[in-house]
């Protein structure tokens, strides 16, 4: 699978390698003599087109006025041959590609320009490339090879990471220790330290954004997604709500934050690495946010009584509510549990791996089930939502576009930023066609009306259980997911593995209910700010 970066990417390692042992992951800590003297150096001042590397040969002589990257159009196929698809997201597709001149293999993320609707979308893509170029050459960060643009797409060519996702490797091993977790968190916090010393705040740290560089036991862990990252500006307070619900810091929800949010997110990852579940858990994203604001950490439930005090001390320091008192990246790397060998090598309870497996990815079936429930609700149950949809759908097409959503929410008194409106659009758009239909709109908003009663869940289960056998079979799941444009092999395999807790190859009603009552339903990397 490839190292590729996108705010809208689908997990790469669907159906990937699952037989690789876990060792403490190779990492490089920035030596003291190589660290910049100031923690927040100025970002590069070169124009974006001077920062993006492309071959000097065969340039197109005329710069097109429609260019996004600010440089001449080039045909990527002059330099690379595109191979199999690695992943598909909201904005485009990632392929394996081979450099024609050398035969070297890379990952190529092709972003469709017609899906970059707003000026902000285009600026986000430029900034992502700029930051990846700026961080290029640093350990534990994916290398970007070059960026190309033609009339239809922007193509990012980057390092191919064949080792797959972090959690997949941990789960595949079947046994796990604090020492292994310490090696992993060292790599993750090393990325944070590099970013902060080079004047970048990541803003979306989560396990899915880290891949292994190869299938080797000692493969390096690489950060792959900088789509929400920004340059740190002296004295600036950030107010956009960004990130993923489970990993978001309390100050983000208060709309006043800085680089300290990355340490909080890394602390959440550490908690999951040690227990298999996130520290702040609820049945919907509002509940998760409430728990984050409270900041009460459970060290009583299993396996915490058997986890070392040193590990718990580090978790507490990383999940300190006050960002001014929160531990820094450099301090994490100096902590005795990380540096002093205090992390024991004894196996952690195997139940942690089971919980981690259930948690590891977004549950597509749950999102689909919410849409099915929305389609079966009565007018009384959804009350004003139909009117709200009609008011936003100004051209009466039956679907809401990004521009309609932005305009409509502003008219309704919303103060969401462009980034947040875009996140809402992506979260609600189940079939990924770039618009929200009526039932997608209802399913994205109905949680506020507590429409999670048993009869609705049972109706949704019956929708999938076509033969009324009391189980959702693989074929029934495939049929339902294809109906909504989600029926690729990897997605079906992912859903079965997440929901089928008794491992009989099908989903019974109890498993379905447990899934529906679990945590957030929103896509990884996005918050749904529509409460």
From Swiss-Prot:
GO terms for cellular component: cytosol; plasma membrane; plasmodesma. This is Calcium-dependent protein kinase 21. It catalyses: L-seryl-[protein] + ATP = O-phospho-L-seryl-[protein] + ADP + H(+); L-threonyl-[protein] + ATP = O-phospho-L-threonyl-[protein] + ADP + H(+). Ca(2+) 4 binds at residues 500, 502, 504, 506, 511. One of its GO terms (molecular function) is protein kinase activity. It comes from Arabidopsis thaliana (Mouse-ear cress). Ca(2+) 3 binds at residues 465, 467, 469, 471, 476. Residues 343-373 are annotated as: Autoinhibitory domain. Residues 48-60 have a biased composition (Polar residues). It comes from the Eukaryota. Interacts with SLAC1 and ABI1. May play a role in signal transduction pathways that involve calcium as a second messenger. Mediates the phosphorylation and activation of the S-type anion efflux channel SLAC1. Ca(2+) 1 binds at residues 393, 395, 397, 399, 404. The lineage of its organism: Eukaryota, Viridiplantae, Streptophyta, Embryophyta, Tracheophyta. Belongs to the protein kinase superfamily. Ser/Thr protein kinase family. CDPK subfamily. A lipid is attached at residue 2 (N-myristoyl glycine). Residues 380-415, 416-451, 452-487, 488-522 form the EF-hand domain.
């Amino acid at each position: 699978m490839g190292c590729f970066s996108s705010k809208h990417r689908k997990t790469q390692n669907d159906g990937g390698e699952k037989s690789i042992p876990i060792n403490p992951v190779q990492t490089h800590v920035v030596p003291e003599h190589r660290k910049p003297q100031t923690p927040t150096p100025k970002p590069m001042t070169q124009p974006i087109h001077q920062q993006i590397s492309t071959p000097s040969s065969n340039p197109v002589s005329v710069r097109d006025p429609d260019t996004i990257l600010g440089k001449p159009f080039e045909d990527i196929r002059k330099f690379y041959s595109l191979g199999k698809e690695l992943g598909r997201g909201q904005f485009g597709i990632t392929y394996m590609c081979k450099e024609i001149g050398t035969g070297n293999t890379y990952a190529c993320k092709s972003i469709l320009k017609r899906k970059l609707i707003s000026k902000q979308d285009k600026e986000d893509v430029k900034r992502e490339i700029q930051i990846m170029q700026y961080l290029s050459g640093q350990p534990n960060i994916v290398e970007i090879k070059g960026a190309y643009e033609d009339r239809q797409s922007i193509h990012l060519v980057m390092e191919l990471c064949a080792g797959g996702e972090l959690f997949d490797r941990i789960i595949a091993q079947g046994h796990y220790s604090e020492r292994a977790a310490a090696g992993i968190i060292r790599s993750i916090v090393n990325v944070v330290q590099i970013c902060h010393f080079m004047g970048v705040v990541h803003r979306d740290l989560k396990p899915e954004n880290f891949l292994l560089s190869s299938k080797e036991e000692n493969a390096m862990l690489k950060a792959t997604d900088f789509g929400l990252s920004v340059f740190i500006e002296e004295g600036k307070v950030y107010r956009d709500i960004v990130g993923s619900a489970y990993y978001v810091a309390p100050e983000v929800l208060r709309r006043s934050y800085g680089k300290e949010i990355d340490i909080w997110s890394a602390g959440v990852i550490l908690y999951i690495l040690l227990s298999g579940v996130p520290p702040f858990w609820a049945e919907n994203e509002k509940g998760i946010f409430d728990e984050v604001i409270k900041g009460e950490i459970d060290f009583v439930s299993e396996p915490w009584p058997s986890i070392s005090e040193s590990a718990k001390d580090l978790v507490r320091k990383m999940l300190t509510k006050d960002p001014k008192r929160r531990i820094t990246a450099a301090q994490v790397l100096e902590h005795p549990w990380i540096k002093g060998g205090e992390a024991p090598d004894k196996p952690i309870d195997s139940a942690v791996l089971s919980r981690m497996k259930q948690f590891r990815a977004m549950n597509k079936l749950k999102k689909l089930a919410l849409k099915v429930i929305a389609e079966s609700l009565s007018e009384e149950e959804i009350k004003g939502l139909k009117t709200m949809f009609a008011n936003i759908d100004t051209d009466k097409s039956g679907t809401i576009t990004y521009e309609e959503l932005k305009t409509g929410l502003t008219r309704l008194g919303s103060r969401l930023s462009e980034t947040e409106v875009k996140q809402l659009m992506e979260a609600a758009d189940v079939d990924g066609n770039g618009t929200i239909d009526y039932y997608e709109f209802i399913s994205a908003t109905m949680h506020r009306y507590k429409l999670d009663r048993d009869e609705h869940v049972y109706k949704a289960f019956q929708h999938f259980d076509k033969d009324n056998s009391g189980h959702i079979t693989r074929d029934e799941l495939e049929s339902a997911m294809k109906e909504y444009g989600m029926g690729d092999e990897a997605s079906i395999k992912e859903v079965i593995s997440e929901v089928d807790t008794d491992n009989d190859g099908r989903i019974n009603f109890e498993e379905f209910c447990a899934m529906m009552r679990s945590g957030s339903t929103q896509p990884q990397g996005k918050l749904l700010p529509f409460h």
